[in-house]
Curated annotation (Swiss-Prot):
This is tRNA(Ile)-lysidine synthase. GO terms for cellular component: cytoplasm. GO terms for molecular function: ATP binding; tRNA(Ile)-lysidine synthase activity. It comes from the Bacteria. The gene is tilS. It comes from Azoarcus sp. (strain BH72). HAMAP family: tRNA_Ile_lys_synt (MF_01161). Keywords: ATP-binding, Cytoplasm, Ligase, Nucleotide-binding, tRNA processing. It is found in: Cytoplasm.
Length: 448
């Protein structure tokens, strides 16, 4: 029995290129699925050479929660493994419901762990439940594709491995019994007030009576849907390139069929690690982009969809407070959730200023500046318009002030009287917004 599960389990590890440099962390609830996962990881560790730890998330929702944490601690101690116990408080006022809120808190704890891969005990029956749950919720292709056995990490978060995803729960229990393993039973798994439990105990048995192979069939359907979702991602990449990159040329974007435009914005949203917008919100955003010339800043899930001067892009809010700084020679200064970098350089791209002379602060009313010899002095509004900086970002632009005069404005440039001459050394300022890859791309060169 051990060999039967070790073979497919090892295939998933090989597919993820797991080796001696890999740091794996097993998500250990104490249930049979996670206990079997930990056992197989322990058996396969000498073959693959990976570093193995475990984590238990203590929700505090059950009177047995402390006992479960102690069980997991004993299990890991017997195997010489380090166990991290993460205690979380599950909010009850989020509107998500207890089941979803607990899952969200658990996920937030797990993805913050210092490892390369999180390893879960999800199995084929879990996959079937997930497909049905998301079908009834009205998910799209990516959601209906459910879980993948190998899910590479994104946004500096660890990847996810599910080596038992093609194994049914019955096979996992049989393995555990044959191997003499012990596990705990979570009484909440029998509570059909929770949607997934209702699917497991009430819906799937009825379907299985008519279609005995429902679990592997739904797993196969999920794999096909993931392939379709991957193809839509490829199409989004092609459409983004045709539109000129992450900051889209508005005229080219407007020429896309509505379904492809929506697909592109969904893909960009996912790439930024944000919550997917609702179908209705996405449709309304596309309608306004088509009908209004801009400037526009429209809510889109966790992000904002912006349109200005013939460009369309997604950005996050930077709500961090702006604090004035006296520059005393530091290589960088914080600015909101971003920063201003200051490096040594020369020529017209450098600023003639000494440490202790410049104050980093927001724009002030009546700000005017001349960008180069022979050029007129322009108002702050005119400078922003010429640089393509939209109205909602202007109050948060960083300005270096010297003796009450604006010497440099982030995204715009250096005032003529503070520019270094050819061969003269000075300081080169560069503004890096909160999310330079998304929020700041429409500003062009940050080092202006």
């Amino acid at each position: 029995m051990a060999v039967e599960l070790a073979g497919p389990f090892a295939e998933v590890l090989r597919a993820a290129a797991i080796g001696p440099a890999s740091r794996l962390c097993c998500a250990l609830s104490g249930g049979v699925d996670s206990v079997v996962t930990l056992d197989l990881l322990t058996r396969l560790q000498p073959r693959f050479g990976f570093t193995l730890t475990a984590v238990h998330v203590h929700h505090g929702l059950s009177p047995h929660a402390d006992a479960w944490a102690q069980f997991c601690a004993r299990l890991c101690a017997a195997r010489g493994l380090t166990l991290a116990i993460r205690r979380v408080e599950v909010p009850t006022d989020t509107g998500q419901g207890l089941e979803s809120a607990a899952r969200a808190r658990r996920h937030a704890e797990l993805v913050a762990l210092p490892c390369d891969w999180l390893v879960f005990g999800h199995h084929q029956d879990d996959q079937a439940e997930t497909v049905l749950f998301r079908l009834f919720r009205g998910s799209g292709l990516r959601g209906l594709g459910a879980m993948a056995a190998v899910e590479p990490g994104q946004h500096a978060m660890p990847g996810k491995l599910r080596p038992l995803l093609d194994i049914g729960r019955a096979g996992i229990v049989a393995y555990a019994r044959a191997a003499g393993l012990e596990w705990i039973e979570d009484e909440s798994n029998a509570d059909c007030r929770f949607t997934r439990n209702a699917l497991r105990h009430k819906v799937l048995p009825v379907v299985q009576a008519q279609f005995p192979a429902v679990a592997p069939t739904l797993a196969r359907t999920a794999a096909l849907l993931r392939e379709g979702a991957d193809l839509l991602d490829d199409l989004a990449r092609l459409d983004e390139n045709a539109c000129g990159g992450p900051v889209l040329a508005a005229d080219v974007f407007a020429s896309l069929p509505a379904a492809r435009a929506a697909n592109l914005l969904r893909w960009q949203t996912a790439r930024m690690g944000a919550r997917a917008p609702s179908r209705a919100r996405l449709g309304e955003t596309l309608r306004q982009l088509r009908e209004a010339p801009g400037p526009l800043r429209l809510p889109l899930g966790d992000l904002w969809c912006c349109a200005y001067q013939g460009r369309v892009w997604l950005e996050r809010d930077d709500e961090a407070p702006l604090r004035a700084h006296l520059w005393c020679g530091e290589s960088s200064l914080g600015w909101g959730a971003g920063q201003v970098r200051l490096s040594q350089g020369g020529g017209g791209a450098a600023l003639r200023v000494a440490a202790g002379e410049a104050m980093l602060a927001p724009p002030a009313p009546g700000l005017r500046m001349r960008l180069g010899p022979g050029r007129p002095t322009r108002s702050f509004k005119n400078l922003c318009q010429e640089a393509g900086i939209p109205p909602w970002l202007r109050p948060r632009l960083p300005v270096l002030w010297v003796a009450g005069e604006p010497a440099w404005i982030g995204g715009i440039g250096i005032a003529a009287q503070f520019q270094c001459a050819e061969g003269e050394q000075g300081v080169v300022p560069a503004w890096v917004p909160a999310s330079a890859a998304q929020q700041g791309q429409h500003l062009g060169q940050f080092d202006r």
